[in-house]
Amino acid sequence: AYDMTQTPSSVSAAVGGTVTINCQASEDISANLAWYQQKPGQPPKLLIYAASDLASGVPSRFKGSGSGTEYTLTISGVQCADAATYYCQSADYSGSAVTFGGGTEVVVKG
């Protein structure tokens, strides 16, 4: 498994603003990186897979980028509904060892 370092731990943004969340892997994970959104009392929702591919039904204001060890989730035109905790996640190629980042709480100020 890999170590995933996610920053920042918390970020606030105004409605309409932009949020950037970073995730650094301890070794090259070859874009084997997903981003999840989790709201209290709900299961995690897949946003991005393979570093930059948007999951079905996810608004295009969510964008994933990066390669090697450095990855970014950008939320443009932030909406109140985007208030949540976001996690990066990687797995080895067997899928047997899954590693999550520590999470980033996004607070949206109306």
Curated annotation (Swiss-Prot):
PROSITE patterns in alphabetical order: IG_LIKE
Paired cysteines (S-S): none
Gene Ontology CC entries for this record: immunoglobulin complex
Pfam families named in the record: V-set
Start and end residues of each stretch annotated as Complementarity-determining-3: 89-99
Chain positions covered by the region annotation Framework-2: 35-49
Chain residue ranges for the region called Framework-3: 57-88
Stretches for region Framework-4: 100-109
GO biological process per UniProt: adaptive immune response
Region (Complementarity-determining-1): 24-34
Region Framework-1, residue ranges: 1-23
Region listing for Complementarity-determining-2, in residue ranges: 50-56
Keywords from the UniProt entry: Adaptive immunity, Immunity, Immunoglobulin
InterPro entries listed in its UniProt record: Ig-like_dom, Ig-like_dom_sf, Ig-like_fold, Ig_sub, Ig_sub2, Ig_V-set, IgV_Light_Chain
Other comments on record: This chain was obtained from an immunoglobulin that had no detectable antigen-binding activity and that was produced by immunization of a single rabbit with group a streptococcal vaccine.
Xref: PANTHER family: IMMUNOGLOBULIN LIGHT CHAIN (PTHR23267)
Protein name, entry field: Ig kappa chain V region 3547
Organism: Oryctolagus cuniculus (Rabbit)
